[in-house]
Amino acid sequence: ISRRKYMTTIGWTPYKYTPVEKEYELEFTHNAYFQPEKIAEIYKDTKSRFKLCPANTQFLKNFWMIRSPFDVELNVNRKEKTCRINQSQRFFNTFINMRWHEFEDTDLALCSFNFQYMFVADEPVWIEVYPAFLHGEPKNTRFINGTFDIYNWQRPVDFSFEMLDDTKPVIVKRGQPLFYVRFISKKLNDDFKLQEIEWTDELLKLNKRCQPQTWVEGLSWKLMKAGNRHRPKKLVK
């Protein structure tokens, strides 16, 4: 029995807001950030017959890759809780979140590079974030995975990771694969396409409504499943 294929459009945009500087938006990221890329492109020159395997094709078809927009070398002094990078203090304040208060002495150090993308959909679609398992994770990192419904919940994704050895630097280069995103819906055999959308005050307002974790622990997941009240019918436009 053949099943009809559906095509769902996912809107994406660089996340252009930072609370670090009042009334400052990261408009330059529009040109600095790379467009998400289909990860199946890694095999475009491969002649191996595994490419004919429908199980492999189905697995890869809804994955996209996110590349690093900047060169960063991060060095951490865990004892003194200080960092040193190859960029300016302004860059560090905006894009690097060394999450000192979110791990214990016995844990691996936790950090986020806030190279953020926001994905939205006009029907229920779940996003999953994965390490760059085909291209290779940035050295000395272990990626933090996640998933949520981008119809109900408007929040960005970023490169959050544990440092495997905080006595050694984490180095990423512009254009280096950082992580993957994958989209899943309830429709059988669904396909997706990505469409760049404009960053707007409306998106920012919706996103701020999806940040209860800043104030109350244990509430985000319950609210995500309930949905963002008063979200407009259409965000992908």
Identify the role of each PLM range:
Residues 1-156, 162-237:
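Non-catalytic terminal segments and appended small domains
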